[in-house]
């Protein structure tokens, strides 16, 4: 019985240690920078272009706020739009650490939106980042997890409206794939 308690304690302490190590690794490579675009604080990687990274997040933040507000204005009773409006917090956009396993992702349907901002060491194009962020908005608004048909339909709807209001410029990823953070974007729901 005593051995089980000791084993259990060691396992719990190991998990806590691994978590703290991850937190240290993450936050030791991240700094908070004030964007010149909107004077807001953004968490970005400690790199020479950190100011540019903060400004890039500020630019995409503005586009996403416009899109979410537009969607709520034209479809205020749509369940996905209502969920998106409720759960989207533009103040949780931040850059993630360099990790080939992750590009951009949403935590708990909008609790955090972690962005990959660099491909091959250079800041990504704002239109590509906007496409990726609209993909993340689709996850926030969609009730299910993953990429089911409802997700793709909502993603397409958001892209169409983003184009209509000038937030996103349509791009044919099938014709000209784009490298984004260790992966290739090869298609879009609009194709």
Enumerate the predicted regions with their spans.
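Walker B catalytic acidic pair
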Residues: 136
């Amino acid at each position: 019985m005593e051995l089980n308690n000791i084993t259990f304690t060691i396992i719990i302490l190991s998990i806590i240690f691994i978590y703290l190590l991850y937190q240290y690794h993450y936050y030791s490579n991240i700094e908070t920078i004030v964007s010149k675009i909107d004077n807001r604080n953004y968490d970005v990687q400690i790199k020479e272009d950190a100011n540019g990274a903060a400004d890039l997040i500020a630019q995409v933040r503005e586009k996403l706020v416009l899109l979410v507000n537009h969607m709520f204005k034209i479809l205020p009773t749509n369940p996905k739009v209502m969920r998106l409006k409720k759960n989207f917090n533009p103040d949780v956009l931040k850059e993630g650490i360099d990790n080939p396993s992750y590009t951009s992702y949403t935590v708990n349907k909008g609790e955090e939106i972690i962005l990959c901002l660099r491909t091959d060491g250079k800041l990504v194009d704002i239109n590509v980042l906007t496409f990726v962020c609209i993909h993340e908005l689709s996850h926030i608004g969609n009730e299910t997890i993953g990429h089911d048909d409802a997700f793709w339909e909502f993603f397409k709807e958001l892209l169409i409206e983003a184009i209509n209001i000038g937030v996103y410029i349509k791009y044919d990823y099938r014709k000209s794939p784009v490298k984004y953070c260790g992966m290739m974007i090869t298609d879009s729901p609009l194709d």
